[in-house]
Swiss-Prot record:
Keywords: Abscisic acid signaling pathway, Calcium, Cytoplasm, Cytoplasmic vesicle, Ethylene signaling pathway, Hydrolase, Lipid degradation, Lipid metabolism, Membrane, Metal-binding, Repeat, Vacuole. It is a peripheral membrane protein. This is Phospholipase D alpha 2. It comes from the Eukaryota. It comes from Arabidopsis thaliana. C2 domain is a calcium-binding fold, and the binding promotes the protein association with membranes. A lower affinity toward calcium can be anticipated for PLD alpha due to the absence of two potential calcium ligands.
Length: 810
């Protein structure tokens, strides 16, 4: 039997196993020893802990809770809603007995994919087989039910958002909210001379917003509460730095501002990730420097409540899993929640306003769309010099600093309360003291969740909140799998997981009609479909579907003869010393991900008579960089970098990457996702890094009969103006061949200028071709002359790590 593609949704129920004999599990001498050891060292239960999993070949897609004290007839009665995009011969149900370290295999049941391919419901008792495919002792069977729904049966497949009645992403913890308002931010600040003229519907022009100024105003004007979560919060930075836009009190640091607000009686609470090991393996590569202990010390003994919050595991994992979670994973949500004046003013009532996205309130984040390397070193960046990619980099040795490109948003209306509730859930689980503002007691001042714009207002938004988080980090999750499923949560091996960010991405990609534009700090995943080139793909476990969904979407459009384009912007390399083991390992995973996608695209082009077409006309990858000529009056450092280092080479060549830290996807100019979640397994898993994101659209600006021309379109055009240094008519339709070829041509030219021996003028734009080649079969190769990133000895295609576990770098 050949493998078949399962692309759609799988509804599965695992009921029970009948008359199980525990020979495969804990019986006999070994079982009694293990039980005694567990009781002696205080782990485990000294009894069977049976659970079942669902796999599509070697990709784990579902797992039940553990059942104790039922060694012969475990009953789970758990249902699963599974997004799939896998090649498989069988759906495999595995029964295991959990141990403190690892698990004992009982056996596996197999249902051929061809039995479910046409959508029939299959409800059967399946033989449980051992590794040799023989029935296990006693002839046990597992009772399961399966039904598959292919994407073509999805009423939203390829249809975009058809109307304002679109209900949002199904099976999620938070429902979609209407009557909201969203402000979109590119970078921490927009100076007054960044003014692209971008026409929108209704005769308006796009107007950019200023993120850190708005956050400064929101904190300054709060009267009752200021709640902040971050991967890092650094007390010594200032939010307002534009000398042409001074603000009263704007010269204060974040730390002093928060202390001042707390002393005025505002409840100021910070949940900052407690970098426990400060993950030594990564830290030596320059990947982590969060100031967590400095921040805690700064607020000690003040009115500000600052809690360092470790990424604690839920209770369901093995000892090894729990150790992995607490030492390897992070709290990555970046939110600010405040009470605010009413939009109309003149009222004593207050409302909730929230900020969500990729920007932490810490050093190295303040930047503008100009992303200067050298010219702000005596002004905005003199006291905020960030360059973790070179050993020993310092303002005294000069630039290039690492420019920072990021995306954030402000949420108003009912959606802002969902962000508040997320904070309350997290504080209740990990904050300790009961100090949250009691909203009921402020009921006469803070209005309950209500629309901030009327449904007739053409600027109105519908917005939904998504997360990656589990019961170890958020209180209030239901205990039973049935209640969890009803709340849009996934039950794992005794932990409850919110994985809705991944679901939101999958849903949006499947809906897409014309094009997708992604900016993300990482791009790796769907490892179940990687080539087994020096690895065992089943051991990588970067199983999230996003890269595979993108390539399957392109393939489906090629088959249908319809135009569809995907643009992806990533950093040149993940932040850190580029030659280091961790950075090189991540680049290797990224290469394997791109390769998997290009192989899909090239195969589809061949099968549809389009052999010889450039796959970059369908799927194209970019990075950002800058290069500046020296100007009179520039900051002169007092020292020099060490000779023959990346640092001195970059300084002399006057170039460096612009770090892409964004986590954003735009679909058809009508739908946008912005958050803290990267396109990697850490962010998309739900039980690894904690994340938050919004997905939203403007009901009056959909891509139905004509192209969408609302805020999302304006935002994309403004980003492209930032990256390409120009506006062009072809950019209005990213789905066209003319557009993708023009963008590729410009990015190729900019890469040639960036990587050339010398440059007589500033780089005219920042968008660079990602420096890889694509062979005829889709294999990723070196671009001629581009084995290493400029000024480094770091391989562009990365190197597989022999010592770093994939769970750390995926």
């Amino acid at each position: 039997m050949e493998e078949c593609l399962l692309h759609g949704r799988l509804h599965a129920t695992i009921y029970e196993v009948d008359h199980l004999h525990a020979e495969g599990g804990r019986s006999g001498f070994l079982g009694s020893i293990l039980a005694n050891v567990e009781e002696t060292i205080g782990v485990g239960k000294g009894e069977t802990q049976l659970y079942a999993t669902i796999d599509l070949e070697k990709a784990r897609v579902g797992r039940t809770r553990k059942i104790t004290k039922e060694p012969k007839n475990p009953k789970w009665f758990e249902s699963f809603h599974i997004y799939c995009g896998h090649m498989a011969k069988h759906v495999i149900f595995t029964v295991k007995d959990a141990n403190p370290i690892g698990a004992t295999l009982i056996g596996r049941g197999y249902i051929p994919v061809e039995d479910i391919l046409h959508g029939e419901e299959v409800d059967r008792w399946v033989d449980i087989l051992d590794n040799e495919k023989n029935p296990i002792a006693g002839g046990s069977k597992i009772h399961v039910k399966l039904q598959y729904f292919g994407v073509e049966k999805d009423k939203n497949w390829n249809r975009g958002i058809k109307s304002a009645k679109f209900p949002g992403v199904p099976y999620t913890f938070f429902s979609q909210r209407r009557g909201c308002k969203v402000s979109l931010y590119q970078d921490a600040h927009i100076p007054g001379n960044f003014v692209p003229k971008i026409p929108l519907a209704g005769g308006k022009n796009y107007e950019p917003h200023r993120c850190w100024e708005d956050i400064f105003d929101a904190i300054t004007n709060a009267k009752h509460l200021i709640y902040i979560t971050g991967w890092s919060v650094y007390t010594e930075i200032s939010l307002v730095r534009d000398s042409r836009r001074p603000k009263q009190g704007g010269d204060v640091t974040v730390g002093e501002l928060l202390k001042k607000k707390a002393s005025e009686g505002v409840k100021v609470i910070l949940l900052v990730w407690d970098d426990r090991t400060s993950v030594d393996l990564l830290k030596k590569d320059g990947l982590m420097a969060t100031h967590d202990e400095e921040t805690e010390n700064f607020f000690r003994g003040t009115d500000v409540n600052c809690i360092l919050c470790p990424r604690n595991p839920d209770d369901g994992g093995s000892i090894v899993q729990n150790l992995q979670i607490s030492t390897m994973f992070t709290h990555h949500q970046k939110i600010v929640v405040v009470d605010s004046e009413m939009p109309s003013g003149g009222s004593r009532s207050r409302r909730i306003v929230s900020f969500v996205g990729g920007l932490d309130l810490c050093d190295g984040r303040y930047d503008t769309p100009f992303h200067s390397l050298f010219r702000t070193l005596d002004t905005a960046h003199h006291d905020d010099f960030h360059q973790p990619n070179f050993t020993g980099a310092a303002i005294t040795k000069g630039g290039p600093r690492e420019p920072w490109h990021d995306i954030h948003c402000r949420l108003e209306g009912p959606i802002a309360w969902d962000v508040l509730y997320n904070f309350e859930q997290r504080w209740s689980r990990q904050g300790g003291k009961d100090i949250l503002v009691k909203m009921r007691e402020l009921g006469d001042i803070i209005i309950p969740p209500s629309p901030v714009l009327f449904s007739e207002d053409h600027d109105v938004w519908n917005v939904q909140l998504f997360r990656s988080i589990d019961g170890g980090a958020a209180a209030g999750f239901p205990d039973s799998p049935e209640a969890a499923a009803e709340a849009g949560l996934v039950s794992g091996k005794d932990n409850i997981i919110d994985r809705s960010i991944q679901d939101a991405y999958i849903h949006a990609i499947r809906r897409a009609k014309d094009f997708i534009y992604i900016e993300n700090q990482y791009f790796l995943g769907s490892s179940f479909a990687w080539s087994a080139d020096g690895i065992k793909p089943e051991e990588i476990n970067a199983l999230h579907l996003i890269p595979k969904e993108l390539s399957l979407k392109i393939v489906s459009k090629i088959k249908a003869g319809e135009k569809f384009k995907v643009y992806v912007v990533v950093p040149m390399w993940p932040e850190g010393i580029p030659e280091s083991g961790s950075v090189q390992a991540i680049l290797d995973w990224q290469k394997r991900t791109m390769e998997m996608m290009y192989k899909d695209v090239i195969k589809a082009l061949r099968e549809n008579g389009l052999e010889g077409e450039d796959p970059r006309d369908y799927l194209t990858f970019f990075c950002l960089g800058n290069r500046e000529v020296k100007k009179d009056g520039e900051y002169e450092p007092s020292e020099k970098p060490e000779p023959d280092t990346d640092y001195i080479r970059a300084q002399e060549a006057r170039r460096f990457m612009i770090y892409v830290h964004t986590k954003m996807m735009i679909v058809d100019d009508e739908y946008i996702i912005i958050g803290s979640a990267n396109i990697n397994q850490r962010s998309m898993d739900g039980a690894r890094d904690s994340e938050i994101a919004m997905g939203g659209y403007q009901p009056y600006h959909l891509s139905t009969r004509q192209p969408a021309r609302g805020q999302i379109h304006g935002f994309r055009m403004s980003l492209w103006y930032e990256h390409l240094g120009m506006l062009d008519e072809t950019f209005l339709d990213p789905s066209s061949q003319e557009c993708i070829q023009k963008v590729n041509r410009v990015a190729d030219k900019y890469w040639d200028l960036y990587s050339s021996e010398s440059l007589e003028h500033d780089l005219p734009g920042h968008l660079l071709r990602y420096p890889i080649g694509i062979a005829s079969e889709g294999n990723i190769t070196e671009l001629p002359g581009c084995e290493f990133f400029p000024d480094t000895k770091a391989r562009i295609l990365g190197v597989k790590s022999d010592y770093m576990p994939p769970i750390l770098t995926t």
